[in-house]
C-alpha cells in the first residue's frame, strides 16, 4: 500500500482543492510517522483488497474463500489488516473498538508487533486516500460505472473526520485496547 507516488501523481484528478489538501495531509502523516520506522515493519505478499465484495461466504455466512487477486503486492504486512479495516471503519460509530477487535482476532492467527499495530491508522487513512483518488481517476475514464464510487462518499466523510483527530492518540487507544 505504499503507493504514495500514485497519490502524488493523481491527486489533481480530485476536483476539490480542499479534498486535495486532505490527501496531502495524510501523505505528510505517512512521511512523518511511517517512513522513519518502515525498516522495522515486516513485509510480505498480501491480497491488498480485503473487503465484503471479495469474500465468498457459505450458506452459514462463514468465509469460504476470497477472490480478486489483481491488487496483490509485496508490502507491509500490517497493510492487509489496514485495507480490510478501511472498508469497515468508514461506517462504524466506534472505529477504535472495531479496529482493536479485528486486530485481536488477527493476532490469534498471525501475530503482529505492537509497532505494526500502532501505525495501522496511518495505513487505514492512506488506503482510503488511494481509494478516493483512484475513484476520481477512474470516473473520468468510465463515467457510467457506479461500482467505482461505491465507498467514495463514506471514505471522504471518514478522511475529513480523521484529519481533525490526533492520530497518535487514536493509535495509542487501539494498542491499549488490543493488548489489555
Predicted regions and their residues:
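Active-site beta-strand-loop-beta-strand hairpin of nuclease catalytic cores
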Residues: 59-63
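Activation of the activation-loop gatekeeper triad in protein kinase-fold domains
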Residues: 67-72
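Transmembrane helix-bundle signature of multi-pass membrane transporters/permeases
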Residues: 123-124
Amino acid at each position: 500500500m505504499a503507493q504514495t507516488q500514485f497519490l502524488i501523481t493523481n491527486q489533481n484528478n480530485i476536483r476539490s482543492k480542499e479534498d486535495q489538501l486532505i490527501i496531502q495531509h495524510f501523505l505528510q502523516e505517512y512521511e512523518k510517522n511511517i517512513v522513519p520506522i518502515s525498516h522495522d515493519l515486516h513485509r510480505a505478499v498480501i491480497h491488498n483488497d480485503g473487503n465484503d465484495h471479495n469474500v465468498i461466504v457459505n450458506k452459514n455466512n462463514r468465509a469460504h474463500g476470497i477472490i480478486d487477486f489483481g491488487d496483490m503486492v509485496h508490502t507491509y504486512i500490517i497493510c492487509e489488516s489496514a485495507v480490510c479495516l478501511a472498508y469497515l471503519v468508514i461506517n462504524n460509530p466506534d472505529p477504535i473498538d472495531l479496529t482493536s477487535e479485528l486486530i485481536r482476532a488477527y493476532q490469534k492467527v498471525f501475530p503482529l508487533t505492537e509497532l505494526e499495530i500502532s501505525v495501522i491508522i496511518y495505513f487505514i487513512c492512506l488506503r482510503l486516500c488511494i481509494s478516493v483518488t483512484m475513484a476520481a481517476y477512474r470516473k473520468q475514464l468510465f463515467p457510467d460505472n457506479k461500482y467505482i464510487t461505491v465507498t467514495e462518499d463514506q471514505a471522504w466523510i471518514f478522511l475529513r473526520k480523521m484529519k481533525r483527530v490526533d492520530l497518535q492518540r487514536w493509535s495509542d487507544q487501539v494498542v491499549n485496547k488490543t493488548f489489555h
